Regions:
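Glycoside hydrolase catalytic-domain context in secreted enzymes
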Residues: 1-180
Length: 180
């Protein structure tokens, strides 16, 4: 199985990284897609998902590490660009449409579909001081507001499970209710 991170939001060819596959048609980044959906309605997500599925299937990419279901609750986090923003209802709508659209069916992955990995469970956008969890000072996801984990961060992951996403990627940070 050939896998990749999403390719439709990055038209830059990087030698040794994505040059062999060529450039895929460019769409706006994930925040741009979310903004367009907010302004034009969710049908755009269906078109986006169908384009991804067809393009990836045509070149033999059958597994995508995409998309981030993280609610951006700390704007200092350097990965905010990969989120659909901070609105849990919009993020949930995006994931609910992307998963079956890319995989090819409401029932899971079809032969023409591309298996998706939704990331970063249980919600990587709650970064302590915006620090990156690849380093010791960024090891915590802090859900300080009572109920924020369930209200803001988990709904899109629940939708991913309901829509039969092929997998969910856990985050490499530790969940906490208080700052370290």
């Amino acid at each position: 199985v050939i896998t990749s991170n999403s390719r439709n939001e990055n038209g830059e060819v990087v030698f040794g990284m994505n040059d062999a596959a060529g450039v895929f048609p460019a769409w706006p980044g994930t925040m741009g897609i979310a903004a367009a959906v907010k302004g034009n309605g969710p049908g755009l997500v269906d078109t986006f998902a169908e384009c991804i599925r067809r393009e990836w299937d045509a070149v033999g990419l059958k597994k995508g590490y995409m998309y981030m279901a993280d609610a951006m609750t700390d704007p200092r986090w350097q990965r905010t660009y990969g989120t659909f923003g901070e609105d849990p209802a919009l993020i949930t709508e995006m994931i609910s449409r992307l998963v079956p659209g890319i995989q090819g069916s409401e029932s899971g992955v079809t032969p023409e579909g591309v298996a998706v990995t939704i990331k970063h469970f249980p919600g990587g956008g709650a970064r302590e001081n915006g620090f990156d969890p690849h380093y010791e000072q960024g090891q915590w996801n802090v859900y300080q507001t009572e109920g924020s984990l369930g209200d803001y961060h988990l709904p899109a992951f629940k939708a991913a499970v309901e829509k039969k996403a092929s997998s969910i990627m856990p985050y490499y940070a530790k969940p906490a209710a208080e700052k370290s």
